[in-house]
């Protein structure tokens, strides 16, 4: 039986490719998609979900827009990475359908309530919507199998020296998720910076030759430009968000450790830092499965294989 999932995302080039991967995978049943503000403004990320589902011919999937700002902070966006639309690069279709009138939290709650089995939540943006769901519906916690997030890092930052972008945008929300008691799987920068797509991989995707693989290649052409800055020391572009979906499909290509994770919400230099108790120094029981390594070639091969689904 296919694994039921809800995707909460802020597209974003890598979010868009995570959607492409999920919807090409019969092992997964995408029950709902909700949008969060982050990579771009809430209006643009919602529109980008609708544009991607229009492209993928999946208007049957319920979509709802989420919180317009973090729980306790003003919104920060990453338009320097993802461009004016949030998905700059390819010519994407205009949305062919409308989102649901309710909120992301209402759609998530309804989806959990109606599911006959626990649902996995995949969250590839800031954790605002998921935290609001957890706080407002404690009765539904048992219906959540796990929460798989792209966010955080052990000892790295890509927005500040200490913090990864998604967690930095709403650290209070991320702390609620990590301390919820629900199993959390964390794809942080330690693994996503190893899940790099190289120029040759982009050409491999382009050569698959269907309309979706072509768009993915064009998304990556744009995404690659930001990551050419020599400060990163990257060969290619790190494909952060698809690591969440890839872990659900092929956990064997990832190396993980079970650790306690907390989120710093106060620090002068460390706001938004995920504090991973790697050496078990706190005495706290592990609350997260933390990805630390990936077989890069296996990751690229999985993407290439699933892009052929759209032939």
UniProtKB/Swiss-Prot annotation:
The EC category is hydrolase
What Pfam family does this protein match (any one)? IU_nuc_hydro
Biological-process GO terms, alphabetical: nucleobase-containing small molecule interconversion; purine nucleoside catabolic process; pyrimidine nucleobase metabolic process
Keyword line: Glycosidase, Hydrolase
Give the matching InterPro entries.
Answer: I/U_nuclsd_hydro_CS (IPR015910), Inosine/uridine_hydrolase_dom (IPR001910), IUNH (IPR023186), Pyrim_hydro_RihA (IPR022975), Ribo_hydro-like (IPR036452)
Q: What the protein does?
A: Hydrolyzes cytidine or uridine to ribose and cytosine or uracil, respectively.
> What does the similarity note say?
Belongs to the IUNH family. RihA subfamily.
Question: This protein is called what?
Answer: Pyrimidine-specific ribonucleoside hydrolase RihA
The taxonomy runs: Bacteria, Pseudomonadati, Pseudomonadota, Gammaproteobacteria, Enterobacterales
């Amino acid at each position: 039986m296919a694994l039921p999932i809800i995707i909460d995302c802020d597209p974003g080039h890598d979010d868009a490719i995570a959607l492409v991967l999920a919807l090409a995978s019969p092992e997964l049943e995408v029950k709902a998609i909700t949008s969060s503000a982050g990579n771009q403004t809430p209006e643009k990320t919602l529109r980008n979900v609708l544009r991607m589902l229009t492209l993928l011919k999946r208007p049957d999937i319920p979509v709802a827009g989420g919180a317009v700002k973090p729980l306790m902070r003003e919104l920060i966006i990453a338009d320097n990475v993802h461009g004016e639309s949030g998905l700059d690069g390819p010519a994407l279709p205009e949305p062919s359908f409308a989102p649901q009138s309710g909120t992301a939290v209402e759609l998530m709650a309804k989806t959990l309530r109606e599911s006959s089995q626990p649902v996995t939540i995949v969250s590839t943006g800031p954790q605002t919507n998921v935290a609001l769901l957890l706080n407002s519906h404690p009765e539904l916690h048992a219906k959540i199998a796990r929460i798989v997030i792209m966010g955080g890092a052990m000892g790295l930052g890509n927005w500040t020296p200490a913090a990864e972008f998604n967690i930095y945008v709403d650290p209070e929300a991320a702390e609620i998720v990590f301390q919820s008691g629900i199993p959390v799987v964390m794809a942080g920068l330690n693994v996503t910076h190893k899940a790099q797509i190289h120029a040759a991989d982009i050409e491999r995707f382009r050569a698959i030759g269907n309309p979706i693989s072509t768009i993915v290649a064009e998304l990556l052409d744009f995404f690659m430009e930001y990551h050419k800055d020599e400060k990163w020391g990257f060969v290619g572009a790190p494909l952060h968000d698809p690591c969440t979906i890839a872990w659900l499909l092929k956990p064997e290509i990832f190396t993980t450790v079970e650790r306690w994770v907390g989120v710093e919400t106060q620090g002068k230099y460390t706001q938004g830092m995920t504090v991973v108790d790697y050496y078990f120094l706190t005495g706290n029981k592990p609350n997260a499965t933390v990805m630390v390594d990936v077989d890069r070639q296996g990751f690229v091969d999985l993407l290439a294989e699933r892009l052929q689904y759209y032939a």
